[in-house]
Amino acid sequence: MGRVRTKTTKRASRVVIEKYYPRLTLDFQTNKRIVDEVAIIASKRLRNKIAGYTTHLMKRIQRGPVRGISFKLQEEERERKDQYVPEVSELEKDKINVDQDTKDMLKALGYDSIPTVVVAASRPERPFRYRH
């Protein structure tokens, strides 16, 4: 069974990561020294728990965004992804190929005036074969 981390440990680790992300690494010993420098922690055991959870979160951050932690680099990455505009829109097509049945359904619904809908040549249906 694993150990449960307290709210104090988790909150302290998140704050340390948000403020000092560029200085932290994936190494526990390095993170332990950084946590010792930047925070006043009452006991050695609590410092080690915070450093351990910080290292754990840093490894998770390497794989992707972590819920509850936002730092400048992650915000910039999210902004860049949100602002992306493709060169060719998927919504604006020159023509849409449909079969005759679909064209008839569009006509019945009153959408027969769409200029981009083109009836594609229907393929001859192959007879269904059973596997023996």
From Swiss-Prot:
UniProt record, GO biological process: cytoplasmic translational elongation; ribosome biogenesis
GO terms for MF: structural constituent of ribosome
Record's GO cellular component terms: cytosol; cytosolic small ribosomal subunit
Note: There are 2 genes for eS17 in S.pombe.
Subunit structure: Component of the small ribosomal subunit (SSU). Mature yeast ribosomes consist of a small (40S) and a large (60S) subunit. The 40S small subunit contains 1 molecule of ribosomal RNA (18S rRNA) and at least 33 different proteins. The large 60S subunit contains 3 rRNA molecules (25S, 5.8S and 5S rRNA) and at least 46 different proteins.
Record's function text: Component of the ribosome, a large ribonucleoprotein complex responsible for the synthesis of proteins in the cell. The small ribosomal subunit (SSU) binds messenger RNAs (mRNAs) and translates the encoded message by selecting cognate aminoacyl-transfer RNA (tRNA) molecules. The large subunit (LSU) contains the ribosomal catalytic site termed the peptidyl transferase center (PTC), which catalyzes the formation of peptide bonds, thereby polymerizing the amino acids delivered by tRNAs into a polypeptide chain.
Protein name per UniProt: Small ribosomal subunit protein eS17B
UniProt source species: Schizosaccharomyces pombe (strain 972 / ATCC 24843)
Gene, per the UniProt record: rps1702
